Curated annotation (Swiss-Prot):
InterPro entries: aa-tRNA-synt_IIb, aa-tRNA-synth_II, aa-tRNA-synth_II/BPL/LPL, Anticodon-bd, Anticodon-bd_dom_sf, Gly-tRNA_synthase/POLG2, Gly_tRNA_ligase_bac, GlyRS-like_core
Record keywords, A-Z: Aminoacyl-tRNA synthetase, ATP-binding, Cytoplasm, Ligase, Nucleotide-binding, Protein biosynthesis
Keyword flag Protein biosynthesis: yes
Principal place of residence: cytoplasm
Superkingdom of this protein's organism: Bacteria
Entry function: Catalyzes the attachment of glycine to tRNA(Gly).
Sequence positions that bind substrate: R97, E145, F192, E193, Q194, M195, E196, E304, T305, S306, A307, G308
Record GO terms (molecular function): ATP binding; glycine-tRNA ligase activity; protein dimerization activity
Primary enzyme class: ligase
GO annotation terms (biological process): glycyl-tRNA aminoacylation
EC number: 6.1.1.14
Name of the protein in question: Glycine--tRNA ligase
GO cellular component: cytoplasm
Amino acid sequence: MVRMEDIISLAKRKGFVFQSSEVYGGLSGAWDYGPLGVELKKNIKSEWWKSMVYLHENIVGLDSAIFMRPEIWRASGHIDGFSDSMVDCKDCKSRFRADFIDLSKNCPNCKVGNNFTSPRSFNLMFKTHIGVVEDSSSEIYLRPETAQGIFVNFRNVLDSSRLKIPFGIAQVGKAFRNEIVTKNFIFRTCEFEQMEMQFFVHPKQIDEWFCYWQQNRMNFFIETLKIRPDKLRFKAHDSTQLAHYAKSAFDIEYEFPFGFQEVEGIHNRGNYDLTQHSKFSNNPKIFEYHDLLTKERYVPHVIETSAGLTRSVLMTLCNAYSEEELSDGDKRIVLRLHPKLAPYKIAIFPLVKKVELVEIARRIYIELCDDFHIFYDDSGTIGKRYRRQDEIGTPYCVTVDYSTIEDETVTVRERNNMTQKRIFINDLYSYIKTEILNYKEDFNK
């Protein structure tokens, strides 16, 4: 069983995630992504973008501003309705989301009897000011979701891209929520990244497309990110759990070390958002769709897929982490990342730091670095270098040895099963490409 302390230790030690502002004592719930973290995050984002935009001819991309006019958040219902209920323990002063604890039992922190304040509403949006004068006219918000930037650009995208219903708009970007409690490492934070797609459909086709996107998104986690199927599940929202904009919703949950938690939501938003913006902007035609074939005019309904990029990073680390007992009694830590997600695809080693071996290793690096992100390492024993790459998920290690000088072959060592093959240098590119393309994960290991 994977433990969170092992994931956190690896993430910090190897440069996936660092505590933000650490030299000043750190900032609770804020994290910086290190050299390996930014690569893993970029690779997940790239696979998501490919699955949404490149593999669907009727989905296009958008990158909307973080700052938007406050009227947008008034129309969307976030100013009045985007809040959580919170309570405080009167004894230890700890603060909790009311829906995260049993108020009839002892405080989870101090274990004293149920001595809580009455639940009170807490708006999750960060408010700030824009301009030189701080008054009500200059109030502005950090966006709590990326979706509204898509909705207010509905007409711009529709007209400029010459799209027809059904179509989607995809976006990856940062969102901000003043969470009552930040916890579980990078899982719940005030600053995070979302991967969202809003799919606009005819009202009569909403159920059909909702089912399609449910299955499509589950397949993405299993087939593309190679998440263990037994660690994933659907969870339906009941009426008390629905967001103010949703008619129905399903979460895709992953079994983290701290239990099953949401990594993506699929929501039937109906025509709530477009209708609200048509009312508040006094411009209903902008949010209306005119079908030239049927002559029908209507406000499209929306299916939303909303995944947490930062949560997906944590899920991927938990899913890939393993510890193995070797035949010599030693322990090996391995990140079994899909090669497409691995921060480095290849590590290149000269067996020893001799000029003739280093020159060949450097030549291979230069020949392949346009196509693969490569780590070069010539220090330490070859065994230790292998172990270092296993820990960060590098799928293939290429070793240049004395035989290379004679026959232009190198040793390619595979991460998961540690098998080694001799490959001609001229065949390295095609060999690695084929291996990545045909990669299969054995979920029984």
